[in-house]
């Protein structure tokens, strides 16, 4: 089973009705090596861990349950929504508290409770008023723009303090993202669900970042297909990662459905074909990159 460096298990199961027991069991049966459940709110870590723990408790096969516990990991971070931006100081205090509570949790037997990454966090200037996040350009006055950068930079600083990689969300905001990274001077982590071109990829890679591709790479029509394949070939083997961002961005042929980590195989199939390798070879490459990045 192919590793998935970015998904939202609680959103997928409790908000979208996915059978989490079936998903985790399938991942375990296919010998998944790594799955990273991603945080988006300062205080969501404990709830997300509890959601996974409840699901594991429902697995009848003890060996299967142990496998799930061995491949599941967690990040903690604050996605740049407007409310969080305007309450940066309190949000950061809450995030730190939740991370440190996990660090000192004594129950290490059934789940990796220690956070292995900060995020997702970053910059989002994709205006989508009718979408789930109701993101409006009118909400982003000068103070909000500054606050968004402040919130991102604070999490980069926290990651440096904790010696953890960062899961970066960057959409329609390359310049601001790069400015924040340069301001802090911390270059360890993933540019998740990568959506820019080769020039931007080069800028991230030159600073040491990994780049993760999701189901969106399978969406492009013929006019843009070669550019996407060129990008997939451009990213070097030792910086390449694959993800789903489940429950979002289900890959073709499942586009429009609720995504799950099981579907990451379609990302590997598409990316490996573009790169001239096999899905199995790419899977091995990604697993080695995961071990290196997260020091596993």
Residue ranges: model-predicted function:
Residues 1-296:
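Mid-domain alpha/beta scaffold segments of enzyme catalytic cores
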